[in-house]
C-alpha cells in the first residue's frame, strides 16, 4: 500500500544541510537543490544551509534537520554527534551507525563478527603487498560513494591504484 507522508512536513521548519568539506561537496549541493525544491513542494519551510565543517548555526526552533551532506562530516558520524548533542531530530542513521557504515574497515569487522558473508578483504598500511588475487577492488576505507575506488584487472594496475588510495587515506581496503 502506497502511503503519502507529504503532510507531515507542511509548515515545519526544516534546516537542509548541504555542501560539506569533502570531495563530494558539488554532488551534495546539487542534491540539496533538488531536495529543497521537493520539500517546498510539500509545504515545508526550508532553510538551505551550505556548511563546510562543524561551525554552523541552525535556525531557531528548527523542527528537523535534513542532512544531504555526502561523505566526510555528513556521513561519518561527526554531524550526527553534533545534532545529537543539541537534541534536534535529523534524517538518516545516528552517530554509531553512521561511523560504522562510513568506515569500511569497521563495517567489514562487524560483518565478520556477525557471520555475515562478504568479499575477502585485508587492510594495507603501506609498503605491503596484497595476498588477494587479481582481479580485486582497492578503496580508501573512509571515503564516501565511489571516491578513490579502483577495479584492478591486471597486476600492472595495482601500484597506481594503491598510490591513489594512499593519497586519500593511511589505510587501503
Predicted regions and their residues:
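Anionic group-transfer/hydrolysis microenvironments
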Residues: 52, 69-72, 141, 155, ...
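Short beta-strand-to-turn element immediately C-terminal to the catalytic PLP-Schiff-base lysine
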Residues: 124, 149-154
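ATP-binding N-terminal substructure of ATP-dependent carboxylate-amine bond-forming enzymes
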Residues: 1-96, 100-109, 113, 125-129
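Basic phosphate/pyrophosphate-binding loop/patch that engages nucleotide-derived ligands
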Residues: 109-118, 157, 164-167
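Phosphate-binding site of ATP-dependent enzymes
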Residues: 16, 153-173
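ATP-grasp fold ATP-binding core
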Residues: 111-112, 132-149, 166-173
Amino acid at each position: 500500500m502506497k502511503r503519502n507522508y507529504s503532510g507531515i512536513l507542511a509548515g515545519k521548519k526544516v534546516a537542509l544541510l548541504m555542501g560539506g568539506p569533502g570531495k563530494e561537496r558539488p554532488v551534495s549541493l546539487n542534491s540539496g537543490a533538488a531536495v529543497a525544491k521537493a520539500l517546498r513542494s510539500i509545504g515545508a519551510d526550508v532553510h538551505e544551509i551550505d556548511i563546510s565543517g562543524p561551525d554552523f548555526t541552525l535556525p531557531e526552533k528548527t523542527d528537523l534537520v535534513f542532512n544531504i551532506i555526502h561523505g566526510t562530516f555528513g556521513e561519518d558520524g561527526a554531524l550526527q554527534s553534533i545534532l545529537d548533542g543539541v537534541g534536534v531530530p535529523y534524517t538518516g542513521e545516528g552517530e554509531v551507525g553512521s561511523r560504522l557504515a562510513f568506515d569500511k574497515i569497521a563495517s567489514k569487522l562487524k560483518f565478520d563478527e556477525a557471520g555475515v558473508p562478504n568479499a575477502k578483504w585485508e587492510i594495507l598500511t603501506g609498503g605491503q603487498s596484497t595476498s588477494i588475487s587479481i582481479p580485486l577492488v582497492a578503496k580508501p576505507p573512509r571515503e564516501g560513494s565511489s571516491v578513490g575506488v579502483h577495479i584492478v584487472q591486471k597486476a600492472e594496475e595495482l601500484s597506481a591504484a594503491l598510490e591513489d588510495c594512499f593519497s586519500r587515506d593511511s589505510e587501503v581496503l
